[in-house]
Each structure stands twice: as structure tokens, then as C-alpha cells.
């Protein structure tokens, strides 16, 4: 049984200019005291073609964590544009929030991110070299992809099989036909994971 349940993730400052920090308000609950820290990460997928372009925007240790409900705002700087392939700068990518305990990842929340120019002229005639200062980042906050993993929470070395789901296939995730058209923009009326995904995020 999982000792930590993520109850809610709220995407803050969305949409925003590309260079603005990512901000997520995370609410989670521990069913008992944790003797070691939780490690949270924000990872930006620079390209679906290769993991070498993934950027860990920030990593923070939270703990020791007592039993009960906790909330914090996780903020991370924007990705380094110099590490993003020019062909992948504009369009749809993914940002991931992960949490590990004793080096074991037990939850991953992925959001589609659409980077596009706000000026009509630039959208119709984009520059060969991306101008990141003109890009707007829009996170599809109402449709996260949640993946949970069984881990060993106890003070022993017993290995547990991953029984919930495997790591998300990012190329598949990015090629989904369900994505809204970038030209139409995305609705930002819902910026919260909230308990609408409770059936997918219940405690293991």
C-alpha cells in the first residue's frame, strides 16, 4: 500500500511567456510518518526523438514528512533554449512532475505543453531560428497523464514489480490525435488536476 497519495496538482501562471518559471501547487497526503525525504523533480522533454534532450529543471527534497496532508508550490526556471533542437522549439512537448522515495519513482504526472508565437505574423512565417522571447507556453492543465508505480516503502531490500503501468511512451504521447490544434489554442478554464482523476490516483 502506498504511503503517499498525490491529491491535487494546480498549474499556476498559465499560459505564460516561455521564459517564465514553471509553477505547480502540489497537495499530497502521507498515511504515516516518512523516515526519509521525498524527492520531487520537474522534467522538460526537449524532444520526443531522444531522452538526451530532457532537462531536469529542478529537484527538491521534502522531508522528513509527518503523517497528514501537505501542500507546497514547486517552482522551476524555464528550460535552457540552447539545449532544445530548433525543430522542436515550437509546437507540442511534455513537462513531467515526478516523485521518488528512497530512489524509487512512485508517481509521474505528465502535461502536454504547447509553445507557439503570439503574433500572427510569426505564426504564419516562423523564423528559421526560433525566437524564444516571442513564444508563449500553454500547459494543457485539464488533461494530465498520471502513471503510478508500486515501490518498496519499507526498510528492506525486497524488490516489487511495477504493476500499475510502464513509463509513458513519449513519442506516442506527443503524437496523439486528441491534442487540440495549436492554432485554435487551448482552454485554460481548468488548471487543476484535482480529484477528477481520483480513480486513477487513489492510494495503492
Curated annotation (Swiss-Prot):
Assembly notes: Interacts with histone H3 (via C-terminus), including histone H3.1, H3.2 and H3.3, and histone H4; the interaction with H3 is direct. Probably interacts with the heterodimeric form of H3-H4 taking the place of the second dimer. Interacts with the CHAF1A, CHAF1B and RBBP4 subunits of the CAF-1 complex. Interacts with CABIN1, HAT1, HIRA, NASP, TAF1 and UBN1. Found in a soluble complex with NASP and histones H3 and H4; the interaction with NASP is probably indirect and mediated by H3-H4. Interacts with CDAN1. Found in a cytosolic complex with IPO4 and histones H3 and H4. Interacts with CREBBP.
Q: Does the keyword Electron transport apply?
A: no
Q: Per the record's keyword annotation, is Metal-binding included, yes or no? A: no
Q: What is its main location?
A: nucleus
Q: Which cysteines are joined by disulfide bonds?
A: none
What's the protein called, per UniProt? Histone chaperone ASF1A
A molecular-function term among this protein's GO annotations: histone chaperone activity
| Residue positions of motif Required for interaction with HIRA | 31-37
Annotated GO biological process: DNA repair; DNA repair-dependent chromatin remodeling; DNA replication-dependent chromatin assembly; muscle cell differentiation; nucleosome assembly; osteoblast differentiation; replication fork processing
Q: Which GO terms describe its cellular component?
A: chromatin; nucleoplasm; nucleus; protein-containing complex; site of double-strand break
Localisation: Nucleus
Q: Which domain of life is it from?
A: Eukaryota
